[in-house]
From Swiss-Prot:
It comes from Streptococcus mutans serotype c (strain ATCC 700610 / UA159). One of its GO terms (cellular component) is cytoplasm. SMART domains: SprT. Binds 1 zinc ion. This is Protein SprT-like.
Length: 145
């Protein structure tokens, strides 16, 4: 079953209303579970929440975005702060906020040879070009995690 069919099924079962547009994956989403676009009515979802393995959480995220969708087309308040949105979200048991995702970010660690200050960086840096910010000592690349 593709994503649009799944969203249509959730809309039919939980709202009793048909979903008329498309749903797609958007891997550029970082902290949000999904987005609703009022301009053309399509929904974007973060694939990280589906890959996490918790189908119940992803279904709640779909309900959240469908609340935006159905309220917008009903001419009611569809934004997060609107009472109509909060009431419908509570009624269908959707999530208010997307749960945090454990990131598997790779870090490089650098330690000053003089003062022992440790620096954590996401990107590797040239230790010949940079020095310690405290004592201007030489930096040494540590084991990465």
């Amino acid at each position: 079953m593709n994503l649009t069919d799944y969203v249509k099924e959730v809309s039919r079962q939980d709202f009793g209303i048909e979903f008329q547009h498309t749903a797609s994956w958007n891997s550029r989403l970082q902290t949000t579970g999904g987005r609703f676009f009022p301009e053309d009515g399509h929904l974007d979802f973060n694939p990280k929440f589906c890959k996490k393995g918790d189908a119940g959480t992803f279904r709640k995220i779909v309900r959240h975005e469908l609340c935006h969708y159905h309220l917008y087309y009903a001419g009611k308040g569809y934004r997060h702060g609107d009472k109509d949105f909060k009431d419908l979200l509570l009624q269908v048991n959707g999530v208010r906020y997307a749960p945090s995702i454990q990131s598997n970010t790779f870090y490089h660690y650098y330690q000053c040879e003089s003062c022992g200050q440790v620096y954590q960086r996401k990107r590797r840096m040239n230790t010949k070009k940079y020095a310690c910010g405290n004592c201007h000592g030489k930096l040494r690349h540590q084991n990465q995690s």
